[in-house]
């Protein structure tokens, strides 16, 4: 039986390159183009190794790796971070959650490096290396523009994560792609339990109807900026506020804000 590999990257051509390399080595390759698709793939299949970029749409790389760790209670199979911004992450490899780290580079050199790497992990039992290091195709150095991009992304994620209100980011198919720690505390669930789950699953039947009405309303009528209602979540009355997310004049999802109701509300 062929071993299965999951490749997750938003770059279609890189996914095809890596898929062809792995197929030639006898692997069955599953593909995903964002972190949310990667989670969905793991719900339907089991894999023997995973390659993922760090900068991913919807659910980013570190969040994706964290999800896998929680879902499989530790070290289920080799998790390989393969990214063009790996060198810029040298100071925070422990925070990424992968077992191995490979920097993207020229395809001809990267092909050699990947074949050497795969041969190595095929010939010995999987045991996560104690020392975290980046495999690179040559002399590479951090780039200022990449560092600035990472800092901006991390800042915006920190704003969401540290907000006093619960914030849930919902994709256009109504599935959850992010929930900050306040939201997780309010609903009494872990991140692994809510990522890629329908947001309606958080609410009981009567309040689910309010949620669905709000989702539809703010999507269809752009002049309506928010829709609010009260819900009982984890035995507490929670003020729930829904607004739509627009990107380049296109609807891409919703923000659901959760705030425990005050006594005089």
Where are these regions (language model features)?
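The feature encodes the CheY-like receiver
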Residues: 15, 56-57
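CheY-like receiver
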Residues: 112-113, 119-163
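Terminal output helix/cap of sensory domains in signal transduction proteins
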Residues: 203-234
């Amino acid at each position: 039986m062929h071993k299965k590999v999951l490749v997750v990257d938003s770059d279609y051509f890189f996914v095809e390159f890596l898929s062809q390399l792995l197929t030639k080595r006898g692997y069955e390759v599953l593909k995903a183009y964002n972190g949310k698709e990667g989670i969905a793939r793991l719900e339907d299949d089991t894999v023997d190794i995973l390659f993922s970029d760090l900068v991913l749409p919807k659910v980013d790389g570190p969040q994706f790796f964290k999800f896998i760790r929680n879902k499989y209670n530790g070290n289920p199979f080799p998790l390989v971070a393969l990214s063009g911004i790996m060198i810029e992450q040298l100071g925070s490899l422990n925070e990424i959650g992968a077992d191995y780290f490979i920097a993207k580079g020229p395809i001809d050199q990267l092909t050699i490096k990947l074949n050497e790497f795969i041969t190595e992990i095929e010939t010995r039992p999987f045991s996560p290396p104690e020392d975290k290091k980046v495999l690179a195709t040559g002399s590479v150095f951090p780039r200022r523009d990449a560092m600035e991009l990472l800092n901006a992304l991390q800042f915006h994620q920190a704003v969401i994560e540290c907000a006093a209100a619960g914030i849930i980011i919902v994709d256009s198919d109504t599935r959850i792609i992010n929930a900050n720690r306040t939201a997780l505390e309010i609903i009494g669930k872990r991140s692994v339990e809510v990522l890629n789950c329908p947001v309606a699953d958080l609410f009981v039947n009567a309040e689910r109807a309010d949620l669905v009405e709000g989702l539809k309303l703010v999507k269809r009528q752009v002049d309506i900026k928010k829709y609010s209602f009260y819900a009982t979540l984890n035995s507490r009355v929670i003020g729930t506020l829904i607004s739509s997310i627009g990107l380049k004049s296109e609807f891409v999802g919703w923000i659901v804000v959760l705030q425990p109701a005050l006594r005089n509300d």
